[in-house]
């Protein structure tokens, strides 16, 4: 079976007339075939106490995602988005249009110095993975007043 990613012929607004003239078509085609490169969007913010990573993983269950820290302080978010299969086993379904990707994904982030990699925590809620990497407490310099003689 061949899946065509173009629009409905009866709807002229959904047809991409410039598809053949697209200079980035090869790159887009590669991105469609390699979801690991394109489909995991991650935000990284720094708070006074932690680095917080938020990843959109729609359709991924908690048991399909993995969070690891490699030696050298590299945070790895990986997993696999399962392909929707024929659930009743009759195989009488026919796909007309497929845009949602499936397959393995992985994102890697080098953590900065001072990240407490032994205290990383992760949670998932409604397809959003949140990874919190606490920061080492910065010691405020203690000032000692020196009397000036003379």
Swiss-Prot record:
Residues 31-150 form the sHSP domain. Keywords: Cytoplasm, Stress response. It comes from the Eukaryota. Induction: By heat shock. It is found in: Cytoplasm. PROSITE patterns: SHSP. GO terms for biological process: protein complex oligomerization; protein folding; response to heat; response to hydrogen peroxide; response to salt stress. Its main location: cytoplasm. CDD domains: ACD_ScHsp26_like (cd06472). Disulfide bonds: none annotated. GO terms for molecular function: unfolded protein binding. InterPro entries: A-crystallin/Hsp20_dom, HSP20-like_chaperone, Small_HSP. One of its GO terms (cellular component) is cytoplasm. The keyword Cytoplasm applies. May form oligomeric structures. Belongs to the small heat shock protein (HSP20) family. This is 16.6 kDa heat shock protein.
């Amino acid at each position: 079976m061949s899946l065509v990613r173009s629009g409905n012929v009866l709807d002229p607004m959904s047809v991409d007339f410039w598809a053949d003239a697209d200079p980035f078509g090869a790159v887009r085609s590669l991105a469609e075939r390699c979801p690991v490169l394109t489909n995991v969007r991650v935000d990284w913010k720094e708070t006074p106490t932690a680095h917080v990573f938020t990843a959109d993983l729609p359709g991924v269950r908690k048991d399909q995602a993995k969070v690891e820290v490699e030696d050298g302080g590299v945070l790895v978010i990986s997993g696999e988005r399962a392909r929707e299969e024929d659930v009743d086993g009759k195989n009488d379904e026919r796909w007309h249009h497929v845009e949602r990707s499936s397959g393995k994904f992985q994102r890697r982030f080098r953590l900065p110095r001072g990240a407490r990699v032994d205290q990383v925590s992760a949670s998932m809620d409604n397809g959003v993975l949140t990874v919190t990497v606490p920061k080492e407490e910065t010691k405020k310099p203690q000032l000692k007043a020196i009397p000036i003689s003379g």
